[in-house]
């Protein structure tokens, strides 16, 4: 069973959202009475029962765009761990380090603190390899001097 994790957020087409809203009360396939805190799994099961399947959101190299964890944890993931996340990704394999994240990443789960968001913004939009290091560093430091992890 494949589903897109809901932690980092959802991206649904207008048609899919309309369909979900029209079938969400289907107690047999979309029951919110099932005992689970995993609403993303419930949503995927509900949509699947109504003919809507999820799309693989990884890039052509298999790097994720929607991440289950914060950037540091995603990057440093120990591929030898035996847990639910490793088992869930067994069919297509986990990636870490430079291969963990697609360049057009959409979101990270747990990145909720304002300082973390500013830090990510600075890394994504103000670190230009064509700039000199000092220009980039000065820009980031002057605009985001209160960043903490």
List the predicted regions and their residue ranges.
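Secretory-pathway lumenal glyco-enzymes, predominantly type II signal-anchor Golgi glycosyltransferases
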Residues: 1-149
